[in-house]
């Protein structure tokens, strides 16, 4: 789509984006090094498959990220890339979110199962709603489970979670194997779903397809 993108892995001690995207073998520096004064370029790794997508791995140990250092870092990288995505771990600790700035969009990702939806509702209830444009991405979506009423329908998931829907990502073999293949085939349903989400983020009006086509 022609946009430069930076992915920042915030999951201290349990980083995974470098492995999922195939740059783990290159990693020498990570986010903690940058926050402690190293040049941003030292800890930034570009995907071989797309020169516009870059990743900064999370610190290898817990406790290296502070609100002050993250705030300064966030302000700087926002001027360097068209899109910056901070990938936070699951949980209700929002202490670092405010360091990124109130102009940030917030995306909660949940599966359609009842436990995950309830967790999303807890996140929504705890999030300072006045500060964030908050949306929901439903991951591992399976239309068959909805049809058979094993899981709640999409409207119920939205109502229970409390978030506005941004998009649906279907259960996909490509996504399951991402840590091995590091890519998603362009003609797959998963790729098309992620592309729809990206277009919406850029301000396009993109309708949700019929459920069985997701």
Q: Which role does the model predict for each range below?
A:
Residues 118-131:
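Conserved C-terminal guanine-recognition region of P-loop GTPase G domains, centered on the G4
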Residues 111-112, 135-148, 168-175:
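G-domain G4 guanine-recognition motif of GTPases
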Residues 4-9, 85:
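Short beta-strand "acidic-cap" motif of Rossmann-like dinucleotide-binding folds
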Residues 178-214:
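NTP-binding/hydrolysis catalytic cores, primarily Walker-type P-loop NTPases
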Residues 79, 91-114:
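Inter-motif core of Ras-like GTPase G domains
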Residues 56-58, 87, 107-111, 136-140:
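Conserved beta-strand segments of the P-loop GTPase G domain that flank and frequently precede/overlap
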Residues 156-186, 194:
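Beta-strand-loop-alpha "switch" segments that mediate conformational coupling across diverse proteins
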Residues 7-79, 173-181:
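P-loop/Walker-type NTP enzyme "switch/lid" segment
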């Amino acid at each position: 789509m022609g946009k430069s993108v930076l992915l920042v892995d915030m999951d201290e001690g349990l980083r995974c984006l470098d492995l999922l995207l195939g740059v783990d073998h290159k990693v020498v520096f990570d986010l903690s090094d940058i926050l402690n004064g190293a040049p941003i370029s030292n800890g930034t790794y570009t995907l071989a498959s797309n020169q516009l997508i870059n990743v900064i791995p999370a610190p290898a140990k817990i406790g290296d990220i502070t609100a002050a250092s993250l705030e300064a870092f966030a302000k700087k990288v926002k001027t360097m890339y068209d899109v910056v995505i901070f990938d936070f771990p699951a949980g209700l600790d929002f202490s670092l979110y405010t360091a990124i700035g109130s102009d940030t969009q917030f995306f909660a990702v949940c599966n359609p199962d009842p436990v995950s939806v309830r967790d999303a509702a807890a996140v929504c209830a705890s999030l300072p709603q006045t500060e964030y444009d908050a949306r929901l991405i439903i991951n591992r979506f399976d239309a068959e489970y909805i049809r058979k009423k094993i899981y709640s329908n999409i409207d119920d998931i939205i109502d229970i979670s409390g978030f506005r829907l941004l998009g649906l990502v279907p259960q996909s073999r490509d996504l399951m194997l991402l840590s091995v293949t590091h890519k998603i085939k362009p003609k797959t349903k998963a790729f098309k779903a992620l592309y729809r989400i990206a277009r919406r983020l850029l301000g396009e009006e993109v309708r949700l397809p019929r459920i069985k086509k997701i």
